[in-house]
Design a protein with these regions (language model features):
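Short, acidic/polar
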Residues: 32-45, 92-95, 203-213, 230-246
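N-terminal beta1-alpha1-beta2 module of alpha/beta enzyme domains
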Residues: 2-73, 196-197, 220, 286-289, ...
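Acidic (Asp/Glu)-rich catalytic clusters
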Residues: 43-47, 66-75, 96-106, 212-217, ...
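Extended, intrinsically disordered, low-complexity segments
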Residues: 130-141, 146, 278-321
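Flexible, glycine-rich active-site loops centered on histidine and acidic residues
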Residues: 20-22, 26-32, 89-170, 247-254, ...
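Hydrophobic faces of well-ordered beta-strands that scaffold small-molecule active sites
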Residues: 20-28, 51-55, 76-82, 105-113, ...
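Conserved, mostly hydrophobic/aromatic
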Residues: 45, 49, 69, 99, ...
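Alpha-helix-loop-beta-strand connector modules within alpha/beta enzyme cores
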Residues: 60-79, 139, 269-283
Length: 321
């Protein structure tokens, strides 16, 4: 990615060496037929001890469903699985920031690189090959982090007497010229509670997202447990993944394949209890815990860069006056 700025925000700067234990997540497919049940289902899963919910596209946009669930849940993380390729990067980053705001710091991004050949035409583009798809995913992820980092935590001053809402010197541009898109920042949304949202890649999405995204840029790996073939071997799979010395750290264990039209919880409560009894997953989250904290990630630092300051034009004029 080529940018007009010398500084980028990478996973290496924001990720801890390793988590304590991975968070247990349950995947919900956003089927429009289930729209009236999502809130109740999310609350039941939270009560059962799930640490997070992932939202996979089943017809309704995953970010929209996550936004619907944010006010009706209290502690679970919310990670929409959404495309990083055939999107408007600025809008995507802003939507995820907004989700972090309304969930009070419980939002994350399960990065997906779209490979369905019918999708590009819906946004007026031609399909990308595998290598270009991986490059685009990396560019969009890096750009999103620049946008998320474009407001300092103290940028909003709300000086009523002085008629000043924000301090422009505490904003910075996210100017990007990538291979297929360009972006001008800063964000139109103040810095969200987590600053930099956690970005994870599921094993099933690793090939399409590319090795650079999965191994270098993302904050960790998602291990999938498909319950359509039963729960046999689930504990062993989680234990084995935690012992792997090479590759990205497993930060999320995701239960997939639930029949949401029947008994949606099925064996999930028992599986959660068994995994916790063996010390294989993190404890259930408490209210007020950010998703970064749950995943074992440190607080995301702000990266001030004088070259990117939003008031740089005014400063330049003053320097030459």
């Amino acid at each position: 990615m080529s940018t007009t700025t010398p500084q980028t925000v990478t996973r290496a700067e924001t990720a801890a060496p390793g988590p304590t234990r991975p968070v247990l997540a349950v995947d919900l497919v956003t089927d429009p037929a289930l729209v009236g049940r999502f809130a109740a289902l999310a609350r039941r899963l939270e009560e059962a001890g799930a640490g997070a919910l992932t939202l996979s596209d089943g017809g309704l946009h995953p970010i929209h469903v996550a936004a619907h669930l944010a006010p009706v849940t209290r502690a679970v993380g919310l990670l929409p699985r959404t495309d990083a390729v055939y999107v408007e990067p600025f809008h995507l980053a802003t939507q995820l920031m907004s989700l972090d705001h309304i969930s009070h710091g419980r939002a994350g991004w399960l990065l997906h690189a779209q490979t369905d050949p019918s999708v590009p035409a819906t946004v007026g583009r031609s399909p990308l090959d595998r290598a270009a798809t991986a490059r685009e995913a990396a560019d969009v992820l890096e750009t999103s982090r620049l946008i998320w980092d474009s407001w300092a935590p103290d940028a909003v001053v709300r000086d009523t007497a002085g008629g000043k809402y924000l301090d422009a010197s505490r904003l910075q541009y996210a100017d990007v010229e990538a291979e297929t898109f360009s972006v001008r920042g800063p964000a139109i949304t103040p810095r969200s509670p987590q600053g930099l949202l956690p970005v994870l890649v599921a094993d099933a999405d690793r090939a399409a997202a590319g090795e650079r995204v999965a191994s270098e840029l993302a904050d960790g790996r998602v291990l999938d447990l498909d319950l359509r073939s039963g729960t046999d071997g689930a504990l062993e799979a989680v234990a084995a993944a935690r012992e792997e010395a090479d590759g990205p750290v497993v930060r999320l264990v995701r239960v997939v394949g639930l029949d949401l039209g029947a008994d949606p919880l099925g064996p999930v409560p028992e599986l959660i209890d068994a995994l916790r009894e063996q010390g294989l997953i993190a404890p259930a989250p408490v209210v007020g815990t950010s998703l970064r904290e749950q995943l074992g990630l440190p607080p995301a630092p702000y990266h001030p860069d004088p070259v990117r300051r939003a008031d740089r034009a005014r400063l330049t004029r003053e320097d030459h006056s």
